[in-house]
Amino acid sequence: MKAIIVKPPNAGVQVKDVDEKKLDSYGKIKIRTIYNGICGTDREIVNGKLTLSTLPKGKDFLVLGHEAIGVVEESYHGFSQGDLVMPVNRRGCGICRNCLVGRPDFCETGEFGEAGIHKMDGFMREWWYDDPKYLVKIPKSIEDIGILAQPLADIEKSIEEILEVQKRVPVWTCDDGTLNCRKVLVVGTGPIGVLFTLLFRTYGLEVWMANRREPTEVEQTVIEETKTNYYNSSNGYDKLKDSVGKFDVIIDATGADVNILGNVIPLLGRNGVLGLFGFSTSGSVPLDYKTLQEIVHTNKTIIGLVNGQKPHFQQAVVHLASWKTLYPKAAKMLITKTVSINDEKELLKVLREKEHGEIKIRILWE
């Protein structure tokens, strides 16, 4: 079958025919691939920059792709022929308690597999076989934006985790019982920053997006339709602090030099949460004893945010459907481009490089 393969830790990517018998199979349901999503993780693997990416045992290549929508070929165990489905990409170690109850996002051994990334073949191939417990149904009404359910699942889990952490505060809701008075700063306005903004606004929190430039057309649409605030941070964050004050939640969605944290930690308010989502690959954070004392004395929390599981995929499906009503203009702009699997030149280009203003590029299997 045709597949997109990589050979981590080496850079490079190929579209080639491979022997199906040499590829990982995960169950009995045959799924024909319709769409794959491309994200920063894929590009880091393609460009040889993701050090945690490893080959499946005994193999010299890895099928790329952890974002996919496919169609069920034969009815089986609650799934009907023709159903659209999305696979959950992280699979448990089979040892620790969290993995045994379907939560490998909290794997205690670190021996989990991640399709298309770590130890498991991914879904950038013509078809694959899977287990029902790792499949989420995608309504045909959101087929146009459904590929976003995978990255959105990670954001669903992240916000769920933040809200769970904030239960440590006796009262974190506002005087009307909502979260409408809580302020969030989302640093970084790429695909992840946009999804964080949309979901925080859906929950009712007040949001500021920040980047070192003016917003793109897509970002401007999100800002206007969700009534989000925007701050150009090219000259630092002093003006934001003076005009808005401190924030209840700060999200680092930049994936940029980690030095950015030194600029935003002073913006975090009492009892606040700093959520780290982006994977920085350079820099260091200057933390003196006074900053650490303040973190302790004012009950601040710093938390790593990663990987949604099946419940979060299901929540993502619901929210994507709701955004087509709540934020219809933004929803229509979330898929930046669709590239045919048969257009190899363009395909290899988008697998290597992010396009300006990109939210999500998807591959169409024809």
Swiss-Prot record:
GO terms for molecular function: aldose 1-dehydrogenase activity; D-glucose binding; galactose 1-dehydrogenase (NADP+) activity; galactose 1-dehydrogenase activity; galactose binding; glucose 1-dehydrogenase (NAD+) activity; glucose 1-dehydrogenase (NADP+) activity; glucose 1-dehydrogenase [NAD(P)+] activity. NADP(+) binds at T189, G190, P191, I192, N211, R212, R213, F277, G278, F279, L305, V306, N307, K354. Substrate binds at T41, N89, E114, Q150, D154, N307. Belongs to the zinc-containing alcohol dehydrogenase family. Glucose 1-dehydrogenase subfamily. It is an enzyme of class 1 (oxidoreductase). This is Glucose 1-dehydrogenase. The keyword RNA-binding does not apply. Keywords: Carbohydrate metabolism, Metal-binding, NAD, NADP, Nucleotide-binding, Oxidoreductase, Zinc. It catalyses: D-glucose + NAD(+) = D-glucono-1,5-lactone + NADH + H(+); D-glucose + NADP(+) = D-glucono-1,5-lactone + NADPH + H(+); D-galactose + NAD(+) = D-galactono-1,4-lactone + NADH + H(+); D-galactose + NADP(+) = D-galactono-1,5-lactone + NADPH + H(+). Optimum temperature is 77 degrees Celsius. At 37 degrees Celsius, shows about 20% activity as compared with the maximal value. The lineage of its organism: Archaea, Thermoproteota, Thermoprotei, Sulfolobales, Sulfolobaceae.
